[in-house]
Amino acid sequence: MPKLERPGPLRERVYEALLELITTRALQPGQHLVESELAGHLGVSRQPVREALQRLNTDGWVDLRPAQGAFVHEPTEAEADQLLSVRTLLEAEAAKLAAFSIDPGDGIEKLLELCDRGEQAVRDDAVDLAVAANAEFHAKIMEMAGNAVLAELAEQVGRRVRWYYTPVARQRGKQSWAEHRELIEVIAEGDGYRAAEMMRAHTEHTRRTYREQVRAQDA
């Protein structure tokens, strides 16, 4: 766990550092979060860590249990299912708008570049890099859609999508990036309705994979 770099508001940097560790699952769901240990790892005092944990609790990332302390939130199947369903709606609309955009040119090149990067990460079994490339890929399509309200809504759920995607990234692997390449072709052709259909199927695959993995772990 790297120590924080200066400058910037300390409480904000501690919050972001802990949130990134949770999102990438460096801190696992259900893991006990000890203030003194986190403070030592980040090279700060316990006060900003305590404030960050309280904020993370408010935002639903951390559970504060009386007489026990702080724990990384363990998402229920229903929570994950609901959020990933909303993600499907947002991303399908974004894919449609991106395909209907007047000149997707530069965006298509960027999407292809991200596909190359994601496929290389899969070959290298670099899960964190694959997850990051996946997030950038979907964010780029959202940007190409050109709808600020849609982008704002997607940003609100984006970090949790990464949280849920990380444990299935290796399993989705090559298939996910193959679906990305098919989607790029349809967007480049300007077929918005087919792009929406393909994105809907793509995100549903991820949702089902996550649900199946959770159920297998609970069995």
Where are these regions (language model features)?
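Short helix-capping and inter-helix turn/linker motifs at the boundaries of alpha-helical repeat units
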Residues: 9, 106-109, 171-174
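Hydrophobic residues in alpha-helical segments
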Residues: 22, 98, 102, 122, ...
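Conserved amphipathic alpha-helical segments that form helical-bundle/coiled-coil interaction surfaces
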Residues: 83, 105-166, 177-185, 194-204
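Mobile beta-alpha loop/short-helix "lid" or hinge segments that flank ligand
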Residues: 57-63, 156-159, 173-174
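Short linear motifs at protein or domain termini
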Residues: 1-100, 207, 211-219
